[in-house]
Amino acid sequence: NDGNGRDSDPHDPGDWTTAGQCGLWQPARNSQHWTLV
């Protein structure tokens, strides 16, 4: 979402979308899955 693809910038907000951005009534999404170690 910062406009320059994948990079090492720690401030990069990722690839999240807001609710409705991908179609009416679609929930917000993020491809990152959290894992507890």
UniProtKB/Swiss-Prot annotation:
Instruction: Specify residue ranges for compositional bias: Basic and acidic residues.
Output: 1-14
Q: Which GO terms describe its biological process?
A: proteolysis
Q: Which GO terms describe its cellular component?
A: extracellular region
This enzyme's EC code(s): 3.4.21.-
- List compositional bias (Polar residues) regions by residue number: 28-37
Q: Where in the cell is it found?
A: Secreted
Question: Which branch of life, at top level?
Answer: Bacteria
Q: Where is this region: Disordered?
A: 1-37
**GO molecular-function annotation terms?**
serine-type peptidase activity
Please tell me which top-level EC class this enzyme sits in: hydrolase
Which keywords belong to this entry? Hydrolase, Protease, Secreted, Serine protease
Q: Subunit composition?
A: Heterodimer of a large and a small chain.
Name the family the entry cites: Belongs to the peptidase S8 family.
Q: What is this protein called?
A: Protease 2 large chain
Annotated source species: Achromobacter lyticus
